[in-house]
Amino acid sequence: MNPAVWLDGEDVVLRLYIQPKASRDKILGLHGDELKIAITAPPVDGKANGHLTKLLGKWFKVAKSLVTIEKGELGRHKQVRVHTPQQIPDEVKAIL
């Protein structure tokens, strides 16, 4: 089991390192024990968190309400749960 991504029942749990204010949204790969994701949103007033949940919902083909930030609301290091994903992105599948 990789410490960055694991299955918990039907859910996928991700330990993330977020790079805000990037030129485009992208999964960059492993960053230590975390999956590094670049997002275009700035880390201001929860915009990055909102953008991240919407983006993960799109990538995993679930409603953004099914993406929960479990740890790290205020920092770059986050633990996120995607409830019953309909699809798992190839970059995530490769390290599962």
Curated annotation (Swiss-Prot):
Gene3D superfamilies named in the record: YggU-like
SUPFAM superfamilies, sorted: YggU-like
Q: Which SMART domains match?
A: DUF167
Q: Which GO terms describe its cellular component?
A: cytoplasm
The protein's matches in Pfam families, at most eight in alphabetical order, are given as: DUF167
Output the PANTHER family linked to this UniProt entry: UPF0235 PROTEIN C15ORF40
Q: What is stated as this protein's family in its record?
A: Belongs to the UPF0235 family.
Report what the protein is called: UPF0235 protein VV2877
